[in-house]
């Protein structure tokens, strides 16, 4: 395909959803409005707002939010004039009833997210989103875990259900530029020309921006990113960094770089109780291909049982645990503890 550098990129901010993982889902209403207002001023195309694990993610398994999804959505919608309010919905966590409530609260776009091999569970939610008239996205998580052609086939399923855009989500921050190129080409080979594609990167191997650039060069229409990289693990592709790189490449992104830079440093970074960066633990996520939002849960388990967070994460990767299996983190920690005691006996 021919790359068109003048094509308007759709910039999708995830600070208020994926970024929620970084502070254990404790955004205040004021935080949400400050961030949403700045993003809207910078003219991003969409602002995703929910618990980090999507609609109804607030739970014992994933962590309780400081507010309900609807409170966060309404708070953002009250101050946004340009961008679409977007929500994440994981079938099995959120329901179509939750989606209708989110729509009534102001959401106009939804990403229906499944594990990369489970697109078939998204049908009901995608079809209902289209009935509501929402911009509807199929979102394939942990996309590094299956080959490109298999991933594309899962995306095609979501397209047949009515998804208008198909995303590859590098939830473990484990992919490199060749992985992205292969998967984006596979998408383009099977999806209808009018179906858009999207890239959701994590920065665990410091490749979030590079991978997003490669995706665009392969025809990707939508790019996820977050202010100061605020997100699970080492964070997402930092929005202000991606936009600066896109600007230097002469791409049409439609946003104001300096407004994003100010928001990242003045509003978002001070909220981080644990720096969102590549370090021993977050690098372990990318190296082992582990779901990025496992990080904070693994840190709690490590502190409780006197283990290294990295050891827990690597074992989770070895067992090929995926999003939704947060309850297994304690099981893994107990197994590691038992193995250590056995060695010491």
Swiss-Prot record:
One of its GO terms (molecular function) is manganese ion binding. The record marks 17 as: Transition state stabilizer. Pathway: Xenobiotic degradation; toluene degradation. The keyword Protein biosynthesis does not apply. The keyword Flavoprotein does not apply. Keywords: Aromatic hydrocarbons catabolism, Lyase, Manganese, Metal-binding, Plasmid. Its EC number is 4.1.3.39. Substrate binds at residues 17-18, 171, 200, 291. It is an enzyme of class 4 (lyase). It holds the Pfam family HMGL-like. It catalyses: (S)-4-hydroxy-2-oxopentanoate = acetaldehyde + pyruvate. Belongs to the 4-hydroxy-2-oxovalerate aldolase family. NCBIfam families: 4OH_2_O_val_ald, PRK08195.1. This is 4-hydroxy-2-oxovalerate aldolase. It comes from Pseudomonas putida.
């Amino acid at each position: 395909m021919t790359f068109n550098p003048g094509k308007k990129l759709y910039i999708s901010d995830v600070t208020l959803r994926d970024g929620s993982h970084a502070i254990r889902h404790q955004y205040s209403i004021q935080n949400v409005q400050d961030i949403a207002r700045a993003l809207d001023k910078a003219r991003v195309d969409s602002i995703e707002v929910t618990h980090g694990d999507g609609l109804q993610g607030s739970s014992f398994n994933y962590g309780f939010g400081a507010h309900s999804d609807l409170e966060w959505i309404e708070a953002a919608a009250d101050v946004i004039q340009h961008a679409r309010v977007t929500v994440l919905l994981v079938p099995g966590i959120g329901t179509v009833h939750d989606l209708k409530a989110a729509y009534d609260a102001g959401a106009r776009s939804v990403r229906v997210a499944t594990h990369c091999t489970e697109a078939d569970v998204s049908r009901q939610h995608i079809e209902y989103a289209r009935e509501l008239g929402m911009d509807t996205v199929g979102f394939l998580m942990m996309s590094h875990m299956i080959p490109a052609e298999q991933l594309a086939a899962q995306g095609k399923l979501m397209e047949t259900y009515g998804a208008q855009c198909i995303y590859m989500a590098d939830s473990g921050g484990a992919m490199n530029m060749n992985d992205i190129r292969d998967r984006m080409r596979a998408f383009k080979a099977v999806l209808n020309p009018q179906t858009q594609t999207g890239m959701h990167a994590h920065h665990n191997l410091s490749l979030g921006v590079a991978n997003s650039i490669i995706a665009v060069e392969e025809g990707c229409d939508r790019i996820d990113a977050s202010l100061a990289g605020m997100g699970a693990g080492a964070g997402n592709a930092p929005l202000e960094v991606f936009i600066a790189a896109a600007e230097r490449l002469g791409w049409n992104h439609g946003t104001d770089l300096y407004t994003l830079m100010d928001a990242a440093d003045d509003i978002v970074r001070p909220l981080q109780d644990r720096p969102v960066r590549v370090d021993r633990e977050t690098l372990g996520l990318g190296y082992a291909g582990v779901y990025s939002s496992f990080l904070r849960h693994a840190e709690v388990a490590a502190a409780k049982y006197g283990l290294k967070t990295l050891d827990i994460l690597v074992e989770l990767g070895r067992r090929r645990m995926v999003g939704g299996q947060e309850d297994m983190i304690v099981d893994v920690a107990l197994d590691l503890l038992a193995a250590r005691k056995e060695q010491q006996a």
